[in-house]
Amino acid sequence: MHIYRTILAALLLCGVAALTSGCPGLAPGSRAYRPLPQWESKFSAQARRDVFPNDVRQKPDGFTNTLVVWTGVITNIEYIADPPPRMVRFYAAHHYFDWIEDISIQRERFFLSPRGEGAFAVQWIAQTADDQKFVDQFAVGDMLIAYGYPTVVRSNYVALNPAQNLRAIKPQWYRTDILDYGRPGEPSKILKTAW
């Protein structure tokens, strides 16, 4: 009888440890952002997350050879056919992102700050059927994760051109009204609970 209680206690202890460890899938928790392994990982590993649109506005030539990653919400999608090649330009409102995936009882995993550093744009070639299939997954209102080189500064946006990689996250997977934060090290606050 004593051995059964010992085994039961050990199993119970292991179960409690697994459920409270924050491991996604077993229980609620958070983890570092996971880029898509096949398409996004190499860019994520190389890109700087500490260069923001206002840095580029203040020093336009200072980051032209620096691969950066910016996040935002797509506000407009524009096709440009002339001059060739056919391009798609995505405009986005920049939002700060803490690079954390929150896995809990709410559906959303990504909590962008309502704040950001203005508009940015990226262009993508859309000449072939495969290019168009890729572009078709993006829509106004999607969260955009864009990797590129900030080489163009306009009065109303900063462009990552050439763009190296893009990822769309549909609106049901992110929110902008839960956490308010800025650049790393700046104060943050909870605006409301996610559920």
Where are these regions (language model features)?
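Sec-dependent bacterial lipoprotein signal peptides
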Residues: 1-23
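OB-fold and OB-like single-stranded nucleic-acid-recognition modules
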Residues: 23-195
